[in-house]
Amino acid sequence: MKKILTLCVALLIAVTTISAKEYKHSLGMVAGLGIGAQYKVMVTDNFTIFEEFGYLGGCLADQTGALPANGAVNNLVRAYQANAAEGQGIKLDWYVGGQLKIGYLQGGAGIIGVGAVGGIEANMTNAPIAFSFDFRPGYGCVLADTGVGGVGAGHAFDFSFNLGVRYTF
């Protein structure tokens, strides 16, 4: 019990003394049309790459109506990021870029798509935490018959608003 208490106190001290002004890596969760894990790396001061893997839920709108979109998806996002404002313990950055989406839907159908990404990120300057909010419109192709309601393969437009929280290091 004493070792656990000592470890907890040490972690608390480490977390409260780490400054998150500038970070290279971050790891956390993102939620929007689906939910998943997100890893972000700052390649340069203004270029960032997000890698996301998670569960996709909801619908994709296509020319025949709506395709069920329950499945797994892997997003690779490349974005330009720049400082918007700083003060009161928060550093705001905005970012804009593109994404490549690869995954599968219920019934075994595959999906591949491209899209745009635009958002804002708030970095806590006194704690190693970052929050993000973004909008992601996209276009994708369903690669096989979904087997649901007779809807076959086709193209689909989708969009999502996403909220993320990450530990920065």
Identify the role of each PLM range.
Residues 74, 156-169:
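Outer-membrane beta-barrel "beta-signal"
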Residues 41-131:
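Gram-negative (and chloroplast) outer-membrane scaffold detector with strong preference
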